[in-house]
Amino acid sequence: MADLLYLPKKASSLKIPAWLMDKLASLGLTMPLSCEALHIMDGSSYTYSSYKAQQQLGWSAGYPKEEFIEYVSHLATQLSSAKKGCSMKTKHLSCQWGHVTLSLESAQLLSVKGNSDNAVFFGQGYGTAKLRLWQLDLSRRVASGRLSEIMGNGALRTDVFQRRLGLVELAERATNIDCAAPTHSWQAMQYQHIQAYTAGINQALSEMKVLPIECLLLHYRPEIFSISDSYLLGQLKYFINSAWQYELFHTRIANRLTPKQHQQLLATFSHEGHQIPPLPLNENGDWHQEVVKALKDGLKGLQYLGLASPDTGSNVIAISGSLTQSGKPLLATDPHMGHVNPNFNLLCRLESDEGLNVVGSHFPGSPGIIVGRNNHAAWGMVGIMADNQDLFWGKLDLENEQVETASGNLPLTKNIHEIKLKNGKSHSFTTYSFAQGRLVSEKNGYGMFLRWPALDDPSGDITFYQLAKCQDWPSFRDALKHVKNSPMMVGYADIHGDIGLQTMGYIPKRHQQIGSLVLSLTEPQHQWLGYVPFDELPCEHNPERGYTLYANQYSESLFTGKVALSNRWHPPSRSRRIEALIQHTDQHTTETLTAIQDDKTDYFAQQAKHFLLPFVPEDKMLSQWDGNTENIQASRLLDVWFQHLTDKLLGKVLKRGSRTLYTDFWPSCRWSILNILQHHIEDWQHEADALPDLIRECYATALVASQKMAHPQVEFQHSIKKPIWLNKLLTGRFPYQGGNRETVHATRQNADFLTQSQAGKNKSIKTKPYTFGPGFKLISNLANRGECVYLINTPAKGSPFFWQLRKTLNDWQAGKRKTTRLANKQNNNE
């Protein structure tokens, strides 16, 4: 006889979508139209374990009926609450640090108020766990290499790689450093804040009767959080910028090119209009001998290891009072990242009686605010593409646990790991490391080691507490000196009228600017020479032009004459477009900065048309187009045209795989291709007089292909990928509305054209979704001590079902921002 489950009363009048009822019915579930009861049709078994159901649900073992009922009840409750949107009742808490009150000021913003800073961080931890427990635990499992315990064998390779990095050991070292620090030091204060934050997480976990739906689906309960878990997620931030992946690509592709081809294909185009060579050149325009040797050695290392076969955009803008309507500065920031559900960030407002008064983005796992504002100042962060990681290869002697280096054979530290799998089995393997790197790959007696700054010193500021309390330019810069993880360019503005940019993070010093290549451990010239001192990092303070901006570009005014930070930068498309929009008026307001943040005009397209269109007089679309990518048909045509030009132009020199990697890894690929077409086509084995035919042919094929393409979607993907029907329930989406990887509102697909342009003559081309773009947008008006205008693309509450994302995604598409105002309080250290 079927078991009967009575659902909450609030679900009784809910109309369940027919498609969902059909899906439940196909799994042996029936649901009355009134939704007053739900039947589990499982015959006589006490376990929901029919083979067919297991396959459809993606479970490898029988699921206890009581917990399956709990899951379906949770699903029905989620369906019901979708009608009311995301809400959270005001919560009053007491802890050893004082009293704290939590509420959702809006569906996008968590508000935490307490009578001490530690009480506030306790509340922030509590609220984060209530809203994002799955995200917290998933991040912890990724960092520690424990995904396979809940996701099965499909996550094993990820776990093995993470165990090779050894982030848990680094986190424990960082924890011990802060724990042992002098009582009144910033490290000791950070430890206390993390202690309070972790206690809040565990308080919420202990009270939680209904776990996040992901935990019910995967049949597990998260463990309590330790203080070192927070430091662990801090270590994970080192890999926001995975420079080492570019080093693999750069070493492979550079060995297939002549110096001329290499400079043409991988040059940096500065904001000021010059080309910066990707590797050091001598006076004749050839590579230095050190570069030649490094290229050959790097390729040799990849061949030994069997790896010889063959990104992001953000903006920060600060405008001084001389160019604003109020006479006070404005600051806008919009970090770009992968579109995920839930968002990597949680917007929070933190207020305490001890002077903490800040609003902005919180990275779940560590207390505090990373990007935001207080009553005195505002700040935003942008990745600088810094080369703060290196790949080294060397000869191994694992029997004697040694590696060959420039200093002779050095001992390796050996650790044996056991990864528990979801099916009850385990996987054992061995990791090796030494002071200069973690062994991430080994083959034929050679190893690849990854080095990053935390191996030298895993400590550092991960809570940004001093930044949250900064009051002026000097205290702002002081607050950044202890930040060591992923290097950033930080934009700044304050109520005193100051604006500026400051680089932060640990960046290695090197003999030569060749950190973007895989290097040999036996070469003394490849060893790190310490780190660039903070006061030598690029910065800009109160420029005469009245504004400062950074959009991942190479600006000669910032970087020329400084220690080399990278060989890879974004093109100046966004920075030049932003600059042009800033120069439209000297009366900027929150509204004008909103328009800049949401701008989808392709600056590069506007420039490229002047060269390309004379070759195709038959064109009727692009000649009338102003570059606004919201005209999807015209924008798509230009994109596909450049994709076909890239494929055709490079086809005689680079294989298909390398061409795919190039368009994916190199942000300035369109600028480089245009430059080659204009000046260097013969260097790529094409006759000069073949240029007109090549451009026309690619236009014709692009026109046909672009007209066949289905309208793409923008997707916010969940980490649970299988079964497919479940992933669809957990993925938010909306129709693509313009933007590309070079517009201010940047969005992108990865290596899209080579996988989408091969459809048959009469078939439509299915386009990949756009899965990268702005994570949130903040604008701070310094004329008002507390005003912050904000917008984020997923709600604070981390419910994964797509129907609960609709309201927030609709606001995101429409650019519908909300405003919050901090209390008019003074910091306790004024």
Where are these regions (language model features)?
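Substrate-recognition/specificity elements adjacent to catalytic centers across diverse enzyme folds
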Residues: K89-L330, P335, N341
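Proteins synthesized as precursors that undergo proteolytic processing into mature forms
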Residues: R157, A174, T198-A199, A454-D478, ...
